[in-house]
């Protein structure tokens, strides 16, 4: 079922072809788009299955509603990631497979990463190699690695590693100390490269649900 996550990387291949609009009036977004809104980078991608509607709100707030979706990714954050402390709060209400996670990419090496805070019915760790644990922000996280072979990425079709930290005590609000995860991954030989974008991401796959998240 790790292929669930691989479906989402198509978003990253597609975004290189998008124009990046500036500040936008509040409106429902239903097709692939990246840009800035109220000082935050945002990204939305869907494969077109089912019904998915994304809305940017004030500052770092966004909401997304989906029904019988194919697959989608959505969220707000920063155009350039870093080892920052990320605050998030709100509601995450999936019926089926969905993730709420800090999500980003690096280059040299090319890495796709997740710090997963909450998820629906499916824990993707069951399909990946367990590497260790890290304790951060009030919970143990299990660390996993997985190789994606000839899959879409931010640089086109490529082979690259995914790194994951999956929180045992799921939550929809709190602070993510990303440095704790990046350092733990590095100690396990899972090094990152130069940061590309970094968002608090709501993803869904063949599911329904809603989320309203504020990022800072």
Swiss-Prot record:
Q: InterPro entries recorded for this chain?
A: ConA-like_dom_sf (IPR013320), GH11/12 (IPR013319), GH11_AS_1 (IPR018208), GH11_AS_2 (IPR033119), GH11_dom (IPR033123), Glyco_hydro_11 (IPR001137)
A Gene Ontology molecular function term of the record: endo-1,4-beta-xylanase activity
The active site annotation covers 112, 203
The family database entries (SUPFAM superfamilies) matched by this protein are listed as: Concanavalin A-like lectins/glucanases
Group of enzyme by EC: hydrolase
Any GO CC annotation of this UniProt entry: extracellular region
Activity at various pH? Optimum pH is 5.0-6.0.
Enzyme Commission number(s) of this protein: 3.2.1.8
- Check the UniProt entry and state the signal peptide residues, or none: 1-27
* A Gene Ontology BP annotation from the UniProt entry: xylan catabolic process
Q: Where is the GH11 domain?
A: 28-216
**Where in the sequence does glycosylation occur per the annotation?**
87
Q: Name one Pfam family in it.
A: Glyco_hydro_11
Pathway annotation from the record: Glycan degradation; xylan degradation
Which keywords are on file for this protein? Answer: Carbohydrate metabolism, Glycoprotein, Glycosidase, Hydrolase, Polysaccharide degradation, Secreted, Signal, Xylan degradation
What is the relationship between temperature and activity?
Answer: Optimum temperature is 70 degrees Celsius.
Task: Give the subcellular location.
Answer: Secreted
Function recorded in the entry: Endo-1,4-beta-xylanase involved in the hydrolysis of xylan, a major structural heterogeneous polysaccharide found in plant biomass representing the second most abundant polysaccharide in the biosphere, after cellulose.
Family statement drawn from the similarity comment of this UniProt entry: Belongs to the glycosyl hydrolase 11 (cellulase G) family.
- Annotated protein name in UniProt: Endo-1,4-beta-xylanase 2
Say which species the protein is native to: Rhizopus oryzae (Mucormycosis agent)
